[in-house]
């Protein structure tokens, strides 16, 4: 069974709803889940915020965070995931985010091609969030990297749900 089927099954059985906040993956995470029958019961909302203004305006990522750490950083990914959960109308209690670079900028500056930052955030019953983040590096063509990043983001949802924070209701 493909990971997206596993995630839909896991979220549905856990009674959880998911929000996505995507940059480099450009909606691939939400699209993978939406391809699974029954995903409407666990996929709440998906944001694609590619630009700094989109990350700030829709997800509440602070300009100072983007300037200090760069757009491809765990700090930005964390604020994206937490911002998705805080967005008006969002009823999700789990969010996954991705920001990264799929190909080289060519100037030798910034993170290497394939660098992807992720965050997974859980809204607790008391309103607080617990958030985990990682950085990974994938190889391949631009779209192979984006696909790998989307699959990786999905593959870690159940892992992080088992840690002490998300289990605390």
Kindly give the residue locations of the regions a language model identified.
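Short alpha-helical segments enriched in small residues
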Residues: 1-169
């Amino acid at each position: 069974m493909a990971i997206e089927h596993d995630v839909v099954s896991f979220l549905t059985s856990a009674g959880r709803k998911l929000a996505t906040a995507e940059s480099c993956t450009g909606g691939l995470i939400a699209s993978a889940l939406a391809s699974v029958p029954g995903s409407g019961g666990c996929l709440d909302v998906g944001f694609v915020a590619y630009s700094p203004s989109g990350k700030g305006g829709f997800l509440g990522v602070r300009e100072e965070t983007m300037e200090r750490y760069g757009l491809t950083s765990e700090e930005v990914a964390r604020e994206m995931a937490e911002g998705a959960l805080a967005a008006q109308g969002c009823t999700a209690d789990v969010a996954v985010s991705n920001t990264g670079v799929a190909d080289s900028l060519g100037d030798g500056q910034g993170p290497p091609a394939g660098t992807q930052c992720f965050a997974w955030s859980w809204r607790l019953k008391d309103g607080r969030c617990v958030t985990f983040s990682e950085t990974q590096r994938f190889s391949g063509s631009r779209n192979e990297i984006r696909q790998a990043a989307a699959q990786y983001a999905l593959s870690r949802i159940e892992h992080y749900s088992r840690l002490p924070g998300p289990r605390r209701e």
